[in-house]
């Protein structure tokens, strides 16, 4: 084969030649080239051929490693080459004394071809492996023929150099060599050396971790641990699967089981067991080519099967589904594990959440049937307190302080009430850990050595983003003042507020059935009398979330699915239900279903189990707890009948006249589950002045940032009450009167008039009309005293 001619090609750019990096020969390759020339000189050959070069490459480490991986018998090849050089190349012997052997054209082409390939690959060093591959291009040479006789092809060499895939299965662990397309470190281990254990490379020994004290002790969870041990002792399908919400302690059960094993607190059948936690990241890292991942996983499975007391723990086990699969291929980690899991030779423990279990794990029926599902529910508050008391010494040692028993109790109770995006005990552990970490931020002189309830409350307030006073408020004090507080905020509905307060106190006193919500109330009465306002103020007073649903959005039959989620096969199945997700995130809340009579009757049927058993199952089969919910429904049924005047004689408005309308609208089983139907009375004229004052104070609160104060004269208050009073429409007409006669003129003054920099607005009456007297702000006094604060009369 002749070298290609460069005739007709454009000359290379001298600037490119200057910046191009010329590859150098590795020291071992230089020695091999000198050895090839020395072999020719020793035999007084006139030319150094490819056969001389190949014989020298047998002793070059990189080339020798490639040939070994490609099943080449180096001793046999060496003997064949030596015989060929001594017998068939005898014609090259020269009689000229002291002459040096000259490389043949093929010899030079091979070296040049290897250098060009290395340079085009962006590397800087030519190794013996590159030269060995280049020899195969000289197809008519005896050197290439001898390699092919050893059943070695160019593909075998390139496959091992680039991918680390050895043709000889007995050649240790597949590894890349110098000369691959990406720079690699030279492996020090040679073929035949003991391989590192796959378990030690890709798994973590939880028993060793427990002996070192890196695992927290397992407290409680006796039922779950007993069930897991029972499954592990089975003959077949001995694979427990821990399924639960994030933060309930699934991984802690597996680690705690290892801790119990080294403490000899397990049955004799598990006394010698070792739990290995699979490191999926280490298993996948570096597996760039097909076959690498499967080879690693099979090695792990084989070693586990050879270890009769081994238990494999896979955290987040849903990640094995699809791991290592090529595009469109079905061979992933889960399919590699199935045969071992079926026969009982491999004991595997997994953990996952309900969401991933439904979305990934449950869909693979062949895999899920090999596991025995164990539900890990959120522990109760007393159980969570026990868990934290057991973990307390570890956190005290880490943070170098102490927690009081009240602090632990407060952490669990407050985390259960206010931190709703995480579950116990994880949320409570986060609270005490962060409370301890907060002390590291203060100076030594101010650092506290004992943390109590106050520090825990401050941390919960930061995590839950609520005012600290709401956290530290005593429940007993709040309940005692509940009636008085609501009466100050909502006017004219004293009887309704008294009935509501009495029902809530009854539930908080523990005299209510434990599986029911705190209260189920139906507020009835005319529009605009404060039904929705009572629910808002109740949530604010108790310091809980208000979940408000306007039932006019749920008038169609299919709209019910928005509350609990769409069924499988329908759009929105993966989004969840607005009602179930909202209560799941805020278990302690006031649930307000506004204008319930406008909803489809199917909504009433959904609420039956909520009012009776405090549970509602969403579209995924998850039961949502409503036991800490105050359910309030408002309705205007009967308001139209109450607004009608009797023919002939007038009558006095009375509360409770809408009872017949309530009975017509709601079914007996729905009404029978209500704690109370609370009727709101129409607002009287004597109440309207208090409502006027409240609206004006709300307006002043909106203007406080603009430094604008409002002073309302008694005449103006009476005028607003007279114009805004409507016994049929409640307080809403009053809001429109205030907007028309006060807010609109104020907007002009705030934007373009005298109130751009603040000031005082006096609201009076002149010629039976509202008049605004605007005073610009006074200049600051020299004494630095502030002007007295003016409030509405």
UniProtKB/Swiss-Prot annotation:
Residues 185-194 have a biased composition (Basic and acidic residues). Keywords: ATP-binding, Chaperone, Nucleotide-binding, Repeat. It comes from Fuscovulum blasticum. ATP binds at residues 244-251, 525-532. NCBIfam families: ClpA (TIGR02639). This is ClpA homolog protein. Residues 1-24, 169-194 are annotated as: Disordered. One of its GO terms (molecular function) is ATP binding. Residues 25-88 are annotated as: Repeat 1. Residues 103-168 are annotated as: Repeat 2. The keyword Metal-binding does not apply. Signal peptide: none annotated. Belongs to the ClpA/ClpB family. GO terms for biological process: cellular response to heat; protein unfolding. It comes from the Bacteria. GO terms for cellular component: cytoplasm. Residues 22-168 form the Clp R domain. Residues 199-447 are annotated as: I.
């Amino acid at each position: 084969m002749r070298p290609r001619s460069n005739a007709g090609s454009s000359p290379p750019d001298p600037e490119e030649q200057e910046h191009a990096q010329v590859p150098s020969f590795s020291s071992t390759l230089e020695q091999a080239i000198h050895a090839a020339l020395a072999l020719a000189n020793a035999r007084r050959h006139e030319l150094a051929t490819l056969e001389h070069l190949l014989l020298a490459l047998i002793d070059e480490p990189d080339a020798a490693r490639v040939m070994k991986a490609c099943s080449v018998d180096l001793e046999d090849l060496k003997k064949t080459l030596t015989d060929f050089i001594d017998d068939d190349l005898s014609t090259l012997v020269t009689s000229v004394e002291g002459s040096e052997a000259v490389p043949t054209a093929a010899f030079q082409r091979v070296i040049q071809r290897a250098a060009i390939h290395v340079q085009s690959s962006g590397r800087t060093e030519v190794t013996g492996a590159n030269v060995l591959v280049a020899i195969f291009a000289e197809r008519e040479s005896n050197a290439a023929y001898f390699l092919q006789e050893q059943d070695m092809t160019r593909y075998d060499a390139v496959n091992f150099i680039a991918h680390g895939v050895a043709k000889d299965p007995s050649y240790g662990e597949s590894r890349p060599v110098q000369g691959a397309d990406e720079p690699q470190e030279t492996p020090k281990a040679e073929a035949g050396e003991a391989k590192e254990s796959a378990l030690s490379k890709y798994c973590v020994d939880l028993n060793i971790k427990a002996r070192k004290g890196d695992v927290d002790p397992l407290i409680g969870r006796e039922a779950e641990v007993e069930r897991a041990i029972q499954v592990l002792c089975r003959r077949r399908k001995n694979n427990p699967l821990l399924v639960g919400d994030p933060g309930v302690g699934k991984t802690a059960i597996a680690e705690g089981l290892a801790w119990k094993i080294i403490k000899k607190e397990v049955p004799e059948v598990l006394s010698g067991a070792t739990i290995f936690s699979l490191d999926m990241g280490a298993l996948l890292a570096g597996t760039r080519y097909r076959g690498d991942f499967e080879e690693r996983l099979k090695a792990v499975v084989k070693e586990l099967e050879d270890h009769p007391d081994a238990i494999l723990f896979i955290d987040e086990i849903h990640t094995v589904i699809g791991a290592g699969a090529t595009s469109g291929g079905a061979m992933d980690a889960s399919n590699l594990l199935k045969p071992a899991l079926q026969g009982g030779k491999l004991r595997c423990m997994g953990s996952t959440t309900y969401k991933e279990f439904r979305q990934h794990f449950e869909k693979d029926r062949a895999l899920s049937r090999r596991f025995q599902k164990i539900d890990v529910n959120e522990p109760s508050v007393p159980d969570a307190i026990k868990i934290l008391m057991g973990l307390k010494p570890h956190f005290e040692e880490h943070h170098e302080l102490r927690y009081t028993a009240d602090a632990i109790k407060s952490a669990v109770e407050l985390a259960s009430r206010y931190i709703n995006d995480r579950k116990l005990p994880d949320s409570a552990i986060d609270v005490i850990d962060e409370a301890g970490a907060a002390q590291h931020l203060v100076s030594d002189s101010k650092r506290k050595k004992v943390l109590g309830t106050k520090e825990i409350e401050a941390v919960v307030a930061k995590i839950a983003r609520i005012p600290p006073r709401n956290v530290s408020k005593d429940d007993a004090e709040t309940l005692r003042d509940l009636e008085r507080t609501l009466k100050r905020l909502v006017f004219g509905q004293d009887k309704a507020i008294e009935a509501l307060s009495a029902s809530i106190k009854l539930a908080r006193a523990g005299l209510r059935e434990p599986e029911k919500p705190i209260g189920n109330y139906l507020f009835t009465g005319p529009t605009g009398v404060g039904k929705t306002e009572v629910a808002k103020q109740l949530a604010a007073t108790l310091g809980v979330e208000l979940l408000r649903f306007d039932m006019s959005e749920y008038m169609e039959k299919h709209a019910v699915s928005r509350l609990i989620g769409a069924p499988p096969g329908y759009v929105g199945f993966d989004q969840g239900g607005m009602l179930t997700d909202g209560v799941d995130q805020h278990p302690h809340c006031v649930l307000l279903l506004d204008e319930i009579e406008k909803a489809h009757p199917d909504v009433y049927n959904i609420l039956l189990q909520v009012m009776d058993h405090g549970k509602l199952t969403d579209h995924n089969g998850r039961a949502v707890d409503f036991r800490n919910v105050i359910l309030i429904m408002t309705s205007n049924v009967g308001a139209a009948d109450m607004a009608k005047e009797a023919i002939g004689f007038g009558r006095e408005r009375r509360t409770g006249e809408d009872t017949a309308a309530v009975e017509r609208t709601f079914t007996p089983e729905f009404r029978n589950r209500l704690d109370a139907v609370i009727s709101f009375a129409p607002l009287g004229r004597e109440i309207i002045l208090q409502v006027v004052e409240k609206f004006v104070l709300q307006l002043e609160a909106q203007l406080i940032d603009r430094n604008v104060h409002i002073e309302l004269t008694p005449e103006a208050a009476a005028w607003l009450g007279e114009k805004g009073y409507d016994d049929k429409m409640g307080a809403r007409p009053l809001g429109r009167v205030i907007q028309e006669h006060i807010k609109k003129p104020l907007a002009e003054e705030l934007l373009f008039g005298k109130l751009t920099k603040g000031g005082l607005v006096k609201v009076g009456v002149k010629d039976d009309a509202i008049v605004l007297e605007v005073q610009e702000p006074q200049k600051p006094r020299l004494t630095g005293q502030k002007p007295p604060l003016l409030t509405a009369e």
